[in-house]
């Protein structure tokens, strides 16, 4: 089993995250932000990564620190679980429809974190969550997990459908990328022999 566990405590947040990359998509998520919980649960369910994520953050200030730090800890746990990355497929991509909305996600577990974000929202909030924080969440998980990540909202009119399609697309792309290729189970998927740098 490929598992990772991270605890992270600062003056702003207190976080415990654990993941099992070879799971079935079970989750226990409590960030204190209901909409963010819903999105992380979608990521777990559709990636088949088991996730436990508990965050106590300074929500009396705003949601920024909780959103950012949850993504950092989750990315670190995924990176830890991937280890030397031997045998992984490495790349994943998907088109993800959610009713009238369609998004495209492509990623490379390269060790070189990059986020290209092409998505916009017509509302400042979804539930109690600021929509500007979604890009920051993906930026943070990309950095912490070492993922090159391209996200595009191709079209859609419902803000909830757009972001849920993005999270589900990210999940399905990750599911493909972390899968073990039995033909190369003992090899790092790079001609350099390492991923990163």
Curated annotation (Swiss-Prot):
Q: What is its main location?
A: cytoplasm
Localization per record: Cytoplasm
Q: Mind naming one GO cellular-component term on file for this protein? A: cytoplasm
Q: What is the top-level taxon of the source organism?
A: Bacteria
In terms of InterPro entries, this protein maps to: IGPD_sf, ImidazoleglycerolP_deHydtase, ImidazoleglycerP_deHydtase_CS, Ribosomal_Su5_D2-typ_SF
The pathway where this protein functions is:
Amino-acid biosynthesis; L-histidine biosynthesis; L-histidine from 5-phospho-alpha-D-ribose 1-diphosphate: step 6/9
Does the record's keyword annotation contain Cell inner membrane? no
Q: Does the keyword Lyase apply?
A: yes
One Pfam family cited in the UniProt record for this chain: IGPD
Q: What is its EC number?
A: 4.2.1.19
Q: What class of enzyme is it?
A: lyase
Question: What is one process in the GO biological process aspect for this record?
Answer: L-histidine biosynthetic process
Q: Which HAMAP family match?
A: HisB (MF_00076)
**PANTHER family in UniProt:** IMIDAZOLEGLYCEROL-PHOSPHATE DEHYDRATASE, IMIDAZOLEGLYCEROL-PHOSPHATE DEHYDRATASE HIS7
Q: What is this protein called?
A: Imidazoleglycerol-phosphate dehydratase
What is the protein's species of origin? Novosphingobium aromaticivorans (strain ATCC 700278 / DSM 12444 / CCUG 56034 / CIP 105152 / NBRC 16084 / F199)
Traced from the root, the source organism's taxonomic lineage reads:
Bacteria, Pseudomonadati, Pseudomonadota, Alphaproteobacteria, Sphingomonadales
What's the name of its gene? hisB
